[in-house]
Amino acid sequence: MEKNQYIVALEIGSSKIVGAIAEKTSAGYLSVKYLQEEQHLNSVRYGIVQNVENIKSSVSRILKNLEGMIDGRVTQVYLGVSGRSLHSIVSEVNRSVTSTEAITQELIDRIIHEATSTPIRNHDTVDIVPRAYFVDKVETPNPVGQFGSSIKIKVNLIVAKPALKLNLNRLMTFGVPVKDYIVTPLAVADQILSESDRELGCMLVDMGAETTTVAIYKDKALIYLSTLPLGGRNLTRDVMSGLSVREVTAENVKKNINNPLDPNNVSNVVIEGVSAPEAANYISARTGEIIANINQQLVDAEVSSKDIQSIILIGGCAHMSGLQQKMAETIKIKVRMGQNPPMLNVLNPEINRMEYIEVFSLLAKASEMIEVGETCVELNRYEDPIFEAPGGYTPAEPSKPANPSKPSKPSKPRRRGWFQSMTDKLSTLMSEDDANEDDQ
């Protein structure tokens, strides 16, 4: 009987770190019950770890808490990769092949690997995503098994500044190895976008605290990935600097305005000493700038809005009132909110929230990658205690009772002999004489 597998994933964002454990049965059923998070400020900027020691301590605490919840030891983790410098670069590899031999998967894998042979200035390749295949200059969805004299493969190289992955490696130096790195926006796209979304054309927009990631799909393939250095914290800081209030106050005001993207229709109320209409002016202006930058990604990807059927919106900032409507009006594409991965069952209602969609997607993706028999958690095992008597003494087994003998008949009193009777009489007489002398 195959044992269940446990998968541990970590997502390090600009405002918080989230760790979670999922359980995968031999039948493929995937569920998550345990999740831990820690908020932080300024230790991660634009998705890149700045204060390694602070984040290392947070990650260590999260894993220890998860170990206590599951009663086991975390042995390895899957770590999400995202950040400001993460983006895609298109690369092509051409190869002449023998026309009498069928193209194999091994050949495809070798050609794709060749795409990483050319170094990219100041960037590391963190993933490779195939985009299109051509056999004898004719595009094909799957070249394996086909015959031809040439093959061309177009791929997306997912690259980032070296510091992004370097600092992730540095913080995971306390004894728990990284099983694999997973590009977070690609994991989310794989898990929440439908086949129809990817085929007809869609744009996945993840609006976080300090970055906004845009992934564009068309004809079932990723065609563009970019990370913008803009997010929800920009709105907060505009209110903070414009109205001279503390950041925590600006954040609370932003969250409590009924319609922050429509200043003309905001209730004229004061929140923590701040005028709601005045704050809405700053929030609306900055949000308009972020939406304009998102729209620009279609131009950079050389894609028309007519080629994109929908925008799927996720991330902490995505829940702001009125954002979906304003984005749809500006970009002229219908917008909807993303949902948690359908293949993953969240058993704890307290953590079944959209704000954890990234770590849930990492767990779902890792469940596809983990090999049979592998696990990320060693559960504690307990055996019934064996008690020993002190001093090594072992009590003997009780012996069987002996066969009872028949009770003997009571013996009759023996008749006293003549000599014994005379002796008793003499003793009595002598005792009486002694007593008389004492009385005199």
Q: Where are the predicted features?
A:
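Short small-residue beta-strand/loop micro-motif enriched in glycine and branched aliphatics
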Residues: 44-46, 222-225
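A short acidic Gly-Thr/Ser loop motif
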Residues: 10-16, 81-82, 204-211, 217-220, ...
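Short amphipathic alpha-helical segments
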Residues: 21-22, 91-92, 216-218, 324-326
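C-terminal region/appendage detector
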Residues: 1-7, 34, 72-76, 221, ...
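Phosphate-binding/catalytic loop of phosphoryl-transfer enzymes
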Residues: 146-147, 195-218, 224
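Nucleotide/phosphate-binding catalytic cleft detector across ATP-hydrolyzing
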Residues: 1-16, 20-76, 81-202, 279, ...
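Residue-level signature of catalytic and energy-coupling elements of molecular machines
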Residues: 9-10, 19, 79, 172, ...
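Short active-site oxyanion
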Residues: 155, 310-311
